[in-house]
């Protein structure tokens, strides 16, 4: 049991390290300007206007789908239920689950703030 636990901890540390590396790669590449622009938006209508200019319909649907997958995973839905409800692939569901378990708590923070 201790060997399995140690391997699980090591895998988690590797995943956390990868997640933090991804975050570090984002910094300093114009991302802060994007985040500042998003934070400047004051209404849902402004969000629609900005994201309509910034993203394709498919990109927006993908982002919304990932957030819904995160919400459903937090509520205890199964992969099959999530796939049937959202159309997300098991790869997408797995990636979101990995972020929920080992990421930077971004999904949790956002979903808690919007009451989901």
Task: Locate each region found by the language model.
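General nucleic-acid-binding
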Residues: 1-41
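Short, Lys/Arg-enriched anionic-surface-contact patches
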Residues: 45-65
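Short, amphipathic alpha-helical "recognition" segments used to contact nucleic acids or chromatin
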Residues: 63-77
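Short alpha-helical "recognition helix" segments of helix-turn-helix
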Residues: 81-86
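DNA major-groove recognition helix of helix-turn-helix
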Residues: 97-100
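Short Lys/Arg-enriched helix C-cap and helix-to-coil transition segments
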Residues: 104-116
């Amino acid at each position: 049991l201790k060997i399995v636990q140690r391997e699980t901890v090591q895998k988690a540390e590797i995943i956390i390290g990868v997640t933090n590396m991804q975050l570090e790669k984002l910094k300093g590449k114009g991302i802060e300007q994007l985040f500042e622009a998003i934070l400047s938006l004051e209404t849902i209508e402004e969000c629609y206007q900005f994201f309509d200019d910034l993203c394709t319909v498919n990109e927006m649907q993908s982002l919304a789908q990932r957030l819904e997958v995160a919400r459903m995973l937090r509520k205890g839905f199964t992969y099959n239920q999530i796939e049937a409800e959202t159309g997300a692939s098991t790869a997408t569901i797995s990636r979101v689950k990995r972020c929920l378990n080992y990421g930077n708590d971004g999904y949790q923070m956002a979903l808690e703030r919007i009451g989901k």
